[in-house]
A protein has these predicted regions:
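A broadly conserved detector of short glycine/acidic/proline-rich loop/turn motifs that flank catalytic sites
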Residues: 10, 246, 297, 345, ...
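N-terminal cationic leader/targeting segments used for protein routing and processing
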Residues: 3-4, 18, 92, 238, ...
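C-terminal outer-membrane/trafficking sorting elements
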Residues: 322-389
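Kelch-like beta-propeller repeat domains
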Residues: 19-318
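Intrinsically disordered, low-complexity boundary segments flanking structured domains
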Residues: 9-15, 159, 318-319, 373
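Bacterial Sec-dependent N-terminal signal peptides
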Residues: 1-21, 376, 383
Length: 389
């Protein structure tokens, strides 16, 4: 069966409308948590630390064997328990650090640790002279670990640092060129770093690439949707992915949005959403052609739950797609003044009683004059439920 995508706008992005299963797997045995540190080495995925459902920062450590669908608890991380921290894997080892801890009120952390899965041992490496921080971007590109942005007790940050694995030394690089922010999305593709979205004076949808060889930043295509923060991300097969998180009101998205970035075309494509509303501060890891998605806080019918779940999504199925029709993306929703569309379309807006209240053609619809309530926006291909606040 062919998968189908709908092209949005002038080939700047596209949207998949086929149903593809997210499969739920075995929960890990620890308490649910937000901000887990997640990574994969070989056929195993790892979940470490985070903030549990009781609001406590933890240091427990779990390994998931993808060949047997089973979890094993490993010895605790030897550093401080922490949340708002990150980790990456490179050349068969993992590197984790930063975040914050409630032990002795030490606040933002600047440490870096290496994990060897063969010996199951941790080694503390050189701390970053950048100072401690929560919610940074952390990725590997060109054999170096890059860390930057985030926030500390002084506010949001825009600095950028490189760690050299061979010399165990840090060097400051060119600052991020946009607004200071924390909790950005980030990944690397072909030794180039990509960083964006996140929360500063606003919640952003802009995106940037950093080239280590020239130490330069360049803005690339923004996400063709509302700004977002506190999701998870990864790269796979030459593309980058942004999954879940909060929207531009720092509240959950109605669906668990999943986006793919292609650097060759500088474009975004929407993929099948994960079950339920979006998650705040989940984690993920990739083994082979499979994405594993875990943890985070999720809302359902007004209630929230901090999860220890695990879901699987087959990434190789994304490659078989067929472009068939023009579609549009509508945001923000709810709205107070305007409805923005990702491309100009003919539209009609109806009240809940079925009365036509607006019609026209364009990519922006002024609705500030309308009463609060529920409306239905009809385009040639779809009808959207719109909430006017």
């Amino acid at each position: 069966m062919k998968n189908i995508i709908l092209v949005i706008g002038l080939s700047l992005s596209c949207h998949i409308n086929f149903a593809q299963d997210w499969v739920q797997l075995e929960d890990y045995p620890g308490l649910g948590r937000n901000h887990p540190i997640t990574f994969s080495i070989g056929t195993d995925g790892y979940v470490l630390a985070g903030q549990n459902e009781n609001g406590t920062y933890v240091k427990d450590f779990y390994k998931y064997d993808t060949t047997t669908d089973s979890w094993t608890q490993l010895p605790n991380f030897p550093g401080y328990p922490r949340g708002y921290a990150y980790g990456i894997a490179h050349n068969g080892k993992a590197y984790v650090g930063f975040g914050t801890s409630n032990v002795f009120d030490i606040g933002p952390l600047d440490d870096l640790w290496e994990y060897d899965p063969v010996s199951e041992t941790w080694t503390e490496l050189a701390s970053c002279p950048c100072g401690g921080r929560l919610h940074p971007a952390m990725l590997e590109a060109g054999g170096q670990i890059f860390v930057g942005l985030g926030n500390n007790n002084s506010g949001n940050l825009d600095d950028w640092w490189a760690y050299d694995l061979a010399t165990d030394a840090w060097a400051q690089k060119a600052d991020f060129i946009a607004e200071e922010r924390h909790h950005p999305y980030f990944f690397s593709i072909d030794d180039i770093a990509y960083v964006g979205f996140g929360h500063g004076n606003d919640i952003y949808n802009d995106f940037y690439k950093y080239e280590p060889l020239t130490d330069t930043w360049t803005q690339v295509a923004s996400l063709p949707a509302e700004g977002r923060v506190a999701g998870t991300q990864f790269s796979y097969n030459g593309k980058g992915y942004a999954l879940s998180g909060d929207g531009d009101d720092h509240y959950y998205l109605e669906t668990g949005e999943f986006w793919q970035y292609t650097p060759e075309t500088d474009s975004w494509m929407s993929l099948p959403v994960h079950p339920g509303h979006s998650k705040w501060a989940p984690g993920c890891f990739v083994v082979g052609d499979v994405l594993y998605f875990t943890s985070g806080l999720q809302y359902d019918d007004g209630n929230s739950e901090t999860l220890n779940d695990l879901w699987r999504f087959n990434l190789d199925e994304i490659s078989s797609i067929e472009i068939v029709a023009l579609e549009t993306l509508v945001y923000p929703n709810p709205t107070t003044d305007k409805i923005l569309l990702s491309s100009p379309v003919d539209y009609r807006l109806f009240s809940l009683k079925g009365e036509l209240v607006l019609e026209g053609n364009g990519a922006s619809i002024e609705v500030s004059q309308l009463s609060k309530g529920v409306y239905f926006l009809n385009t040639k291909s779809k009808t959207y439920k719109i909430i006017k606040e």
